[in-house]
Amino acid sequence: MWVMVVTLAPIEPKVRPNTTWQHESAPVDITAARWVTIVWDDPVNLMAYVTYVFQKLFGYSEPHATKLMLQVHNEGKAVVSMGSRESMEVDVSKLHAAGLWATMQQDR
C-alpha cells in the first residue's frame, strides 16, 4: 500500500495575495517497515536438525546457526531473519515445511 504525503509550504515566508505555493510530495510505502521471522522452541525437533535447517534455508555458517539454535532452545525463541513482509512470509513457509514452529511480526 502506498500513501502520498503532501506538504504545502509558501515559497516566501509571508503569505501575500497572489502567493505561489510549492507542492512537495513523496510516496511513502507503509508496508516497507522491517519484519522479522521468529522460530519457537518445540518438543519435537532435535537441536542438530534445527541447526541444519538454519544452515540450509538461510545459508548461515555452522557457528551462527548453532548460536541461533541455542537461543531458541534456551530462551524459547530467536529471530532468524528480517526483511520485507513478503520475504518473511516465504521464510515462515519454508520453516513450516521443514517442521519448525515459526511466526513473523513487524519489528519495533
Curated annotation (Swiss-Prot):
GO biological process: protein catabolic process; proteolysis
InterPro entries: ClpS (IPR022935), ClpS_core (IPR003769), Ribosomal_bL12_C/ClpS-like (IPR014719)
Coiled-coil positions: none
Transmembrane parts of this sequence: none
Job of this protein: Involved in the modulation of the specificity of the ClpAP-mediated ATP-dependent protein degradation.
Subunit field text: Binds to the N-terminal domain of the chaperone ClpA.
Family in the record: Belongs to the ClpS family.
Name this polypeptide is given: ATP-dependent Clp protease adapter protein ClpS
Organism field: Mycobacterium leprae (strain TN)
Gene that encodes it: clpS
